Amino acid sequence: MPSGQFLMEDFAYAGGLQAVVRQLLEARLLDGDLLTVNGKSIKENAGSAEVFNADVIRPVTAPLTANGGIAVLRGNLAPNGAVLKPSAATAELMQHTGRAVVFDSIDDFHARVDDPTLEIDASSIMVLRNCGPCGYPGMAEVGNMPLPAKLLARGVRDMVRISDARMSGTAYGTVVLHVAPEAAVGGPLALVQQGDQIVLDVAGRRLELLVDPGELERRRQAWRAPPSSRQGYQALYVKHVLQADRGCDFDFLVGCRGAAVPALSLIHI
């Protein structure tokens, strides 16, 4: 599991997701009347799910940690939010100010990250942009950037990393993800330049770029959107996908769900 000592199989045998949902419903932390993709409510799906191992699925009154597993950060670098997984982060980096080392794409990252001449040290903040829902259609799991080889050789095992991409739920590191709005649509991440100072303050839920507002506006005026596909499904996707803070759904589907879809069984006995 992302946090704790148990495996995914242990979670399943302990009752699984619906057991967690039922506990949250009983604690009145979820609205059980909301509909889900199968046309049933959250409460209906949870049904009579039980917890069979309280060491794996802890009760709400005795959580694994005092704080939640996800921290939502906001600031001038992420006006609509970004997320970080504190349980996977390094405690010493949860309050950190560092110099930005910027990669404009995943290709740029792979081309330069292990260059011995790259100006980067353990205090730097790695920034990977144009990897969000529009910049890298599908929002690939590339946010947990591997550290530079020369720093790994010196024993560095974690650094602050910021991206509009996502990462696997079982990945580790002090990684800020899902920055919204993303760089490809002109979000502030697009305006970060090499050497800019960035502040990460997890306790304060802040993510700030220490650049004068006037300078940021000058950069905004000079910014140009990166090229994107103009045909086929990819073009449709880029045109209609919403940002990470809105679930990366299609804009034309918002408000159009809520009922079960009738279907004929293909199996007749």
Model-inferred region functions:
Residues 1-182, 187-266:
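Catalytic or ion-coupling anion/metal-binding cores of large enzyme and transporter domains
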